[in-house]
């Protein structure tokens, strides 16, 4: 992976760099003085795909921008902190998700999900938890009849406490505490099907979940 932060207009006019630009491993970033540079690096760099992260300087560039080396070191350090935090979480939960998925394979042919009828004329909304959800609940609720709502993980209790009952609740979070916090809001009446991860843990018939 190559990260490019500064290219002069003159360089583009003198050399055809199309063969470099079109490569998927080449990413262009904002100037180092831009506040989003470390976040952009974190979004571009995937350790499991790109391997180790190195910074190499062209000596003429380094001599021309003597103060940039320290700035780059700070930005990459910030980016690595972001990546480490996210990567460690993904590694931990990824193993649990994979384990649960494999445990569910033998049940895939046993259970047949019976989903409720959906008005295909409505607009589907997939909701995730966050500040924008809390701010937008009232707007969605005021036009409830035109939406089919899918609530993911912790968005479900947020919707319920805000007076917005989703049509579907989807969760692949392997934390058992999540079930304790999510399911207290589910009305076990009428047309209600539970898709439960690791169905072998329950004696009741549950549908498998991916």
UniProtKB/Swiss-Prot annotation:
UniProt xrefs under PANTHER family: 6-HYDROXYMETHYLPTERIN DIPHOSPHOKINASE MPTE-LIKE DOMAIN-CONTAINING PROTEIN, MOTILITY ACCESSORY FACTOR MAF
A Pfam match: MptE-like
User: Which InterPro entries does the entry mention?
Assistant: MptE-like (IPR002826)
> Looking at the record's lineage, which domain of life comes first?
Bacteria
* Name this protein carries in UniProt: Uncharacterized protein TP_0175
